[in-house]
Amino acid sequence: MWRGVPGCLRDIVQWQVALWSHSFVRTWGSCGKAMTEALSAQAEAAGGLKALVQPNGDAGSNTSGEPLLERLEPAAVGKQVPESGDQAQGGEGQLPSNGEQTPAPVADSGKRKKRRGATGERVVPPPKKRRTGVSFSDEHFAETTYYFEGGLRKVRPYYFDFQTYCKGRWVGRSLLHVFSTEFRSQPLSYYEAAVRAGRLHLNEEPVQDLSIVLKDNDFLRNTVHRHEPPVTAEPIHLLAENNDVVVIDKPSSIPVHPCGRFRHNTVIFILGKEHQLKELHPLHRLDRLTSGVLMFAKTAAVSEKIHEQVRDRQLEKEYVCRVAGEFPDKEVICKEPILVVSYKVGVCRVDPRGKPCETVFQRLSYNGRSSVVQCRPLTGRTHQIRVHLQFLGHPILNDPIYNSTAWGPSRGQGGHIPKTDEELLRDLVAEHQAKESLSMLDLCESDLTPGLIDSTAPSSELAKDSLEGLATAAQKIDGIAEAAPQHLDTPEKAAKADVTQETDPLCAECRVLRQDPLPQDLVMFLHALRYKGPDFEYVSPIPAWARDDWQED
């Protein structure tokens, strides 16, 4: 190959090969020690090149006159053939020019390196499954205790963590921006005090600065001092219990499961704490103000079996209610479709775009002012009975939503609503604000933020243990503009209060004395009387307001 080629040119070519090899090794150094040793052997062949090339300057210098070979690292040339004794003393790992030692190449261990961001970049850990299931354990039940006062079941205030992963619309925005635009129920001073108190965590690390920019998969946790509204002190009666199901007579005013501001004051928690009935599967649901038969399955298999019966229309549900006016004495069937106006407020209406529904009504009695009506829903839409009765012109007598003047002069009869959905919700909320009865809508002042109308958002996105609940539970109260007291200006003073105490220095709700709800605020005249299937039938006692001799106050 080299026959007829001058020796000097041959040496130059070999040197160029060694130089290219050096560049390759630096780029792909992780390929292993074997490759490095092979390239070093090749470089040894050009060991005397420096002395041959530099005198005539053909290839030993660049345009600046600096010898190229002097700038090569020993990892590229391997063992150099010594030109003099002082160069030979260093051996492998020596720089030819200054004698500084460079570590020899290290072979790849074969282990995958931990992902690191660029200098100064915040690395977000991968998401984790943080919930093992939907059931609640003794740890949850032990968060707080009940006490009873004035015919009400009350919950002692307690600390609670709202948790969520960063939502897509938050990515690239600072925490400060998110709080100031989406959680305006509290002033920024509250969140700043929460940072000082160690209440805000990002990926389980305390937030030090609200200016931190959120990334995808960021996990946020906010600790709040939680207050729950009172419910009736009426006990939950068991109608039946066996190896498959638990059946209760649910009192009015108690939600079935945690939602909004309610957690311990729910059927699920009361059954777990007071009856040791845990890991139950709700087979259907009742509105908070609705009373009557409520069924739970004890196993997933039983739950699936009964839900299959529901899909096959094998179950029969029967309700009783008291409605305004004289209901027709013949059977009435309503098939009007129902559309959700707002998941957050919990408002629906008849609309052609809604889901198909069917309810069968039959009057049972009339006392001259109101009627007791039997209701048999053949479908199971939200507020189906209440909306259909409103459409028929006979709303439930004390329905806080569908018997309201906010719907207009006809109160929604025949679907005539002379206002937009936005106007309807605004007027409905304003009416209850004036009566100081927002709790009838399962709202408080802190809920009255932009975005009240959210007809496209599923309710699960608005409630479950997430920062969405922050606007509900962070507690901004009427007339309180500053949620973070001035004496919390140091980390020591802002330290998290003892979890056993019922007051918290950051909590505005702790500084407000709220009136208890009146007895009439805890009841709606709608009762689930009977639940019947192919092999079971459960009936609850008829309430006092449904009797023929009942008279209005």
From Swiss-Prot:
Belongs to the pseudouridine synthase RluA family. It catalyses: a uridine in mRNA = a pseudouridine in mRNA. It comes from the Eukaryota. It comes from Mus musculus (Mouse). Residues 76-135 are annotated as: Disordered. The modification Phosphothreonine is found at T490. GO terms for biological process: mRNA processing; mRNA pseudouridine synthesis. The active site is at D287. Pseudouridine synthase that catalyzes pseudouridylation of mRNAs. InterPro entries: PsdUridine_synth_cat_dom_sf (IPR020103), PsdUridine_synth_RluA-like_CS (IPR006224), PsdUridine_synth_RluC/D (IPR006225), PsdUridine_synth_RsuA/RluA (IPR006145), RluA_PseudoU_synthase (IPR050188). Keywords: Isomerase, mRNA processing, Phosphoprotein. Pfam families: PseudoU_synth_2. One of its GO terms (molecular function) is pseudouridine synthase activity. NCBIfam families: rluA_subfam. The keyword Cell division does not apply. Its EC number is 5.4.99.-. Disulfide bonds: none annotated. This is Pseudouridylate synthase RPUSD2.
